[in-house]
């Protein structure tokens, strides 16, 4: 379980997080929605201890994450970056198993390649691409390779940062459904940040809306369309009139 209580974060005089309270149940898939620039990525970085928050508390399975920047702490996480973030200079299988090869587990290259093969199959790719380089793959295939890398270490918690950015609608749906499949089959806790409502409907068990530095609404995915929250209604329907300012 991940618990956030009164988390605040500012950069200079600009407050990004103004007291975030959030409870993320173990094994659930939470999607954090909100317009661009509302602090979704900053919030994820605070959970990962990549940014130090100014006030509040973040507990991961009952342990506060402040100053937890050691390898053991990060081993519990997987991450699918917005741009994929694959290494162009190494083959696909090494991209997938990169973290395993850098770990203290002393895994052999042959074992790492076998794990990469298994993860490729999970994301619907053939293993005959393992010795290719990222530049030889399509954007959708690269995204699936990045997803395979995110699950290579069998993490307990996976973060998805705008997972369908830059993809056409068909491939976006492929990625959304793969994420949902992996979350269910692996039983992981998933946290996704997006402004894509279609992605939200496929991936989420629970939804939280972040705006003005705070969580404005939380609920189950089947409550999203009947939230009776003006901000949520404006956002999911793309309305120009409402409590959310369009001056951003």
Task: Explain the meaning of each model-derived region.
Residues 65-78, 224-227:
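ABC ATPase NBD coupling module
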Residues 158-161:
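Catalytic Walker B motif of ABC-type/P-loop ATPase nucleotide-binding domains
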Residues 48:
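Helix-to-loop junction immediately C-terminal to a conserved catalytic motif
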Residues 109-128:
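Conserved ABC ATPase "signature" region
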Residues 90-98:
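Short coil-to-helix segment of the ABC ATPase nucleotide-binding domain corresponding to the Q-loop/switch region
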Residues 154:
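Conserved catalytic motifs of ABC-family nucleotide-binding domains
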Residues 133-137, 141:
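Conserved ABC ATPase signature
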């Amino acid at each position: 379980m991940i618990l956030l209580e009164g988390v605040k974060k500012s950069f200079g005089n600009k407050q990004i997080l103004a007291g975030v309270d959030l409870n993320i149940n173990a094994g659930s898939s939470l999607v954090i929605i909100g317009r661009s620039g509302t602090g979704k990525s900053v919030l994820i970085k605070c959970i990962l201890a990549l940014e130090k928050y100014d006030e509040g508390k973040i507990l991961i399975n009952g342990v506060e994450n402040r100053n937890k920047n050691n390898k053991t702490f990060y081993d519990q996480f997987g991450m699918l970056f917005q741009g994929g973030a694959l290494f162009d200079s190494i083959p696909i299988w090494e991209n997938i198993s990169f973290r395993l090869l850098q770990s203290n587990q002393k895994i052999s290259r042959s074992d790492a390649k076998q794990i990469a093969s298994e993860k490729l199959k999970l994301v619907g790719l053939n293993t005959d691409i393992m010795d290719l380089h990222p530049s030889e793959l399509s954007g959708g295939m690269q995204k699936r390779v990045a997803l395979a890398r995110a699950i290579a270490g069998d993490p307990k918690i996976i973060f998805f940062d705008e997972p369908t950015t830059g993809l056409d609608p068909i491939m976006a749906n492929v990625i959304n459904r793969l994420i949902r499949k992996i979350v269910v089959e692996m039983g992981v806790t998933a946290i996704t940040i997006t402004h894509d409502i279609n992605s939200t409907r496929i991936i989420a068990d629970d939804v939280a809306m972040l705006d003005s530095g705070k969580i404005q609404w939380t609920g189950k995915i089947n409550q999203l369309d009947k939230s009776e929250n003006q901000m949520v209604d404006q956002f999911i329907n793309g309305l120009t009139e409402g409590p959310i300012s369009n001056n951003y």
